[in-house]
Each structure stands twice: as structure tokens, then as C-alpha cells.
Amino acid sequence: MMQESATETISNSSMNQNGMSTLSSQLDAGSRDGRSSGDTSSEVSTVELLHLQQQQALQAARQLLLQQQTSGLKSPKSSDKQRPLQVPVSVAMMTPQVITPQQMQQILQQQVLSPQQLQALLQQQQAVMLQQQQLQEFYKKQQEQLHLQLLQQQQQQQQQQQQQQQQQQQQQQQQQQQQQQQQQQQQHPGKQAKEQQQQQQQQQLAAQQLVFQQQLLQMQQLQQQQHLLSLQCQGLISIPPGQAALPVQSLPQAGLSPAEIQQLWKEVTGVHSQEDNGIKHGGLDLTTNNSSSTTSSTTSKASPPITHHSIVNGQSSVLNARRDSSSHEETGASHTLYGHGVCKWPGCESICEDFGQFLKHLNNEHALDDRSTAQCRVQMQVVQQLEIQLSKERERLQAMMTHLHMRPSEPKPSPKPLNLVSSVTMSKNMLETSPQSLPQTPTTPTAPVTPITQGPSVITPASVPNVGAIRRRHSDKYNIPMSSEIAPNYEFYKNADVRPPFTYATLIRQAIMESSDRQLTLNEIYSWFTRTFAYFRRNAATWKNAVRHNLSLHKCFVRVENVKGAVWTVDEVEYQKRRSQKITGSPTLVKNIPTSLGYGAALNASLQAALAESSLPLLSNPGLINNASSGLLQAVHEDLNGSLDHIDSNGNSSPGCSPQPHIHSIHVKEEPVIAEDEDCPMSLVTTANHSPELEDDREIEEEPLSEDLE
């Protein structure tokens, strides 16, 4: 029985081996089929084949187990003996694993198998393991091949896509090229039409140029005819009696060619220049006062001096000389555009050996075309500019000659109104002869009055301003609003580098009053100064210091702390008080001026004496002073007396001060003021330098000129 069971196990093992071999053969066949199928199509993979083979092996093992169970039910005695043999077979069939050591011990204890059989089993197991390893390696290879195939397929797909894209791009490019060709083909008729239009335009330009040249020729002929007529009128040309009845158009044919007329014009202008040089080098007597010089100057201004040439055989010597030279022109020896072997065409300067070559060059290079006509137009513009310049220079020369022929004229009053403030004091000689001694007054060195050397001028009522305007001068000056002065001259002050005739305090107040909320910061005041006046766009350090000084100095400017910072406002009441103080005179200015009760009468006498000594024939000659001028002098005296009375009423006189003789200089101060009436271009105010109003006014008017503080 033991031998039979051993033989059964061996047979079973052989069967198992055969089964495994069959399985391996099936797997090999499946793998071959898988390869062939993988080569032919990628629908069935090797993984699915392996799963199928394993399922087939499991089904075969299950069938064997069922057969053994049915046989065990039929013979229960033999089933007990076969159980230990069935376990390894079933295990080997179901799971192709190696026999465990426990199973080996059980087999040895039961002494079922002999050592040879065990060796055979071990060899079979080793063979099975080798087959399993081979299967695993084969499986790995299959996977690698599948991956490679997938990668190749992806690469092929990408290449195909790229090729398709390239083909599409090529097709698009071809389509674009075709479209461009079609457009070009469509545009060809348009180009032809454009070329035709250009040709037509060129033809029109050529026709216009011909017309233009004809007009130029006509204009030149007219100018020549007019010039001939003017020469005939001036006596330079004498036409024979037989030719007097010829029409105007026949003048060039009868007398001169265009080249001859040009040469004649050059010679006439040369004669004029020689005469002008003779006038300049010969010298002029500027001290003549007779009427003949004035009449000659007026005639020279009306028409330039012309020297009449002697007439020979009814024609001038100039014409004879010109006609002698015209024979050389006819031979071709000279040409306006040819000289010294060089073409004189503007911008050409090509060298021509002889006149014939020049004519060929002129006909070939400077024919009637666009370039030549353009150069002709440029030359016309050059001639026009030179004519304009020549006319200006002639006018200047005529004005110079007129000025030199005339006697020295008196200077005309400037259109800008001037305020002539004459602070007149007494000289040393008048102090010695005066019956009363005068106290010393503080004076500042000023420029003396320059004596006028011209003849005495008569003061007419039209040139004398109103006396009431003179008396209102000090009071009205401060009441004129600044906006009325800046508004009409806004653009002038904005663009011209001119110092505005206002104090810094007035300008600061104007800046604050122009703002919307009547308050400005310091930077905003600076920006208003630079925006309104071009003068303040330079020397910022100087005038900005003056602005800050005025803001801190005057009480009318109030500093207010705000959320944004410190702003400046104007106290209008304080500002008006300051103005009224300046109008009436500051007590500090009046305090230092000593006066006496008899000062007014002595000053009036000294004024007349000083004016008499200062080379002013207007005041020294009573015959030339009319009623208006005498009223003016009376108004001046009244102003002086009123100022003296004002000083005396304030009680600032110092009778204890000893009188000392002092030399006082006469000076005239010219300053721009605002004209009150358009009919009064001049305002003459003559006061003494002791007046408090004058001192206060001087402080206000000189304040804008001091850049350091105010």
C-alpha cells in the first residue's frame, strides 16, 4: 500500500509537472499569440492572457479536488491515507509555491516518500521556481515592450500632429500669398490709374509753369517800361520827337534791351551810392539854423538826389556806353548767368570753357522742368527779401540824412506820464543875501538838474495839467486800487521782466484778496508772485526774504493757525489805518524836521532865485509864461505854504535851534505814476524836501526798489 501511494504521488507529481509544462507551453503559446497579437493589434494585452492562464490552472485544480472528494466518499479507508498526499499537490496546483519545511517534516515523519522521491520532488520544485522566474522576467519584458510601444505611438501621434500643423501653416501661407497676388493684381489697374493721374498732373504743372513764365516776362516788361518812364521824367533819357508818339509797349524795342535796362539801373544806383558817399565824407554842418537847410532836407527826403548827366545827341552818355557794351553781348562774350568760365545758375557752378559750351550746358541742364522752375521761385523769394531789406535800409539812410541836414531838434516828451518832483533848496549865495536865516534840513544826495541848451519852449494850456489834479496827487495815489493797474497790464507784467511799481505790502494784500477764501499760505503767496510777475521768477532769495519781512513787520497781516497749517489774512481796518497814516504823514518823520514861522516866505523867495540861477529860461522869462503856467506856480506855492502850516500846527518846530548856512543841491526826480486824466500826460509837482508828505511818498515809492527788506 505504501508503495502504491508513493507511486501515486510520483504520478501526481509527474502529472503536476506535466500540467505545469502544459501550462508553461500554454503560456508560451499565449505569449507568442500575445506577441503576434501585439504586433498585429494592441487590442489584447499580455496581462489579460496571464490572468486567463491562471484562471484555467485554478479551474483544473478545482476539478481534481472534486474528483478526489468523490473518490474519497466511495472508499473512506483509502481517503485517510491519501490526505497527507493531497495537501501538497493541491497547494502546488492552486498556488505554485515551494513546499514549506513543516510539510517536509510531516512527509519525513510519515515516511511516505523515499529520499530519491524527495530529491525528485525538490528538482521538480526547482524547475517550477525557474519557470516562475522565467515567467516573471517575461512579464517584465512584456511590460517594457508595452511601454515602448505606447511611447512610440505617442511620438508618432505627435509627429503626425506636427506634420498636420506644418501642412496647415503651409496651406495658410499659400492662401495668403494667393490673396496678396490677387490684391496686387487688383491694384495694378489702380497703379496704372495713379500713373495716368501723375502724368496729367505733370502736364498741368508744365502748362502752369509756362503761364507763370509768361506772366514773369510780362511783369519784367512792365517794370522796364515803368523804369524807362521814370528815367525819362527825371531827364536821364531823352526820346527823339519822332518816337514820342510811340506806345509804351514799343519802348524796349525802340530804345533798350532788358540787359541794357538792368545795366542802366546798376549804373544809376552806383551814381546814387557815390553821391551818398560824397555826402558822408564831405561832412555836414549840424549847427546851421537857416531855413535853407531844412528845405533841402525835406526835398532830399521826398526824392533821392540824382545827378543829371549831360545829354549828347538826344541820349545820355550812360546809354551810349551801355550800347557800346551791348555789341559785345551780342557776340556772346558775356552773359548774366556766365562769368569767369563758371555757370552762375544758383547751386550749379559748373565749369564751362567757352560761351558755346555754356549755352549747351544751359539748354541741357537748366531746361524747363520742375527743378529749374523751383529754383526760379526760390530766386524770386530771395529777390523779394532783398528788395524788402533794401527798402528798409533806404528808409534808414533817408532818416539819417534828414536828421543830419536838419538842425538839432528838441526831445519829444515820452508817452509815459512822468511826475517831475523838484525838491529845490537854496544855494550859499542866496542864503547870504536872504534877510532871514533858514534852519538846516536833512537832505539826500540826488542828481542835479541838467541845464537845457535848446531854445525856450512855451508852455501851452494843453501841456499843463490841471491844478486840482496836482493838489489831489498825494491823497488820490493811495486810493487807486492795485487791480485797476494790474488788470489791463496783466499780460505785460506776466511776460516782461519789469519791476511792478508797488510795495511788497500792497502786492501781498492783492495776492490774499484775489484768493477765494481770502487767506493764503506762504508758499501760495510765493507762487502768486512768480505767476503774476515775470520779474519775481529770478532772485528768489532776495524778494522772498522781503515778503517774509513785510508779513512780520506790518500789523495788517494776521497769521492764523489752521488745520492745513499757518495761513495769512489781511486786517482791512489796520491796512486802511496804515494808508491814512502815510497820507497825513508819520509823526516820526515830522518830528526831526525843524521849521520856523518865516520859513514859507523865505522859501518862496529862494525858490524863485534858485530857479532863476538853474538855467531855466522858462521861469526867468516872464513873457513866455502864460496864464496856465502862472496858475501852476501859484498852486505850487500854495502847496508849499499848506505843508508848512501843517508842520507848524503839529507843534514840531524847534526855535532854539541855531540857524546854520548849508548848501542845498537842486535835484529832479522822475518817476512813473498813474495818469489820472488822459488829457494830462505830464504832472509837474514842485515841493521842498522838508514836506512830510514828500518824505512819506518817497518812502512808499522807493520801497519797491529796495530788494533787501521791502
Curated annotation (Swiss-Prot):
Residues 383-404 are annotated as: Leucine-zipper. Signal peptide: none annotated. InterPro entries: FH_FOXP1_P2, Fork_head_dom, FOXP, FOXP-CC, TF_fork_head_CS_2, WH-like_DNA-bd_sf, WH_DNA-bd_sf. Residues 287-300, 433-454 have a biased composition (Low complexity). One of its GO terms (cellular component) is nucleus. It is found in: Nucleus. A zinc finger (C2H2-type) spans 343-366. Disulfide bonds: none annotated. It comes from the Eukaryota. CDD domains: FH_FOXP2. Residues 1-44, 272-334, 433-460, 644-663, 673-710 are annotated as: Disordered. One of its GO terms (molecular function) is zinc ion binding. GO terms for biological process: camera-type eye development; caudate nucleus development; cerebellar Purkinje cell differentiation; cerebellum development; cerebral cortex development; epithelial cell proliferation involved in lung morphogenesis; forebrain development; gene expression. Keywords: Coiled coil, DNA-binding, Metal-binding, Nucleus, Repressor, Transcription, Transcription regulation, Zinc, Zinc-finger. SMART domains: FH (SM00339). Residues 273-283, 321-332 have a biased composition (Basic and acidic residues). Residues 499-589 bind DNA. Residues 417-421 are annotated as: CTBP1-binding. Pfam families: Forkhead (PF00250), FOXP-CC (PF16159). Residues 1-28, 310-319 have a biased composition (Polar residues). Residues 694-710 have a biased composition (Acidic residues). Forms homodimers and heterodimers with FOXP1 and FOXP4. Dimerization is required for DNA-binding. Interacts with CTBP1. Interacts with FOXP1. Interacts with TBR1. Interacts with ZMYM2. Transcriptional repressor that may play a role in the specification and differentiation of lung epithelium. May also play a role in developing neural, gastrointestinal and cardiovascular tissues. Can act with CTBP1 to synergistically repress transcription but CTPBP1 is not essential. Plays a role in synapse formation by regulating SRPX2 levels. PANTHER family: FORKHEAD BOX P, ISOFORM C (PTHR45796), FORKHEAD BOX PROTEIN P2 (PTHR45796:SF1). The leucine-zipper is required for dimerization and transcriptional repression. This is Forkhead box protein P2. It comes from Rattus norvegicus. The lineage of its organism: Eukaryota, Metazoa, Chordata, Craniata, Vertebrata. The gene is Foxp2.
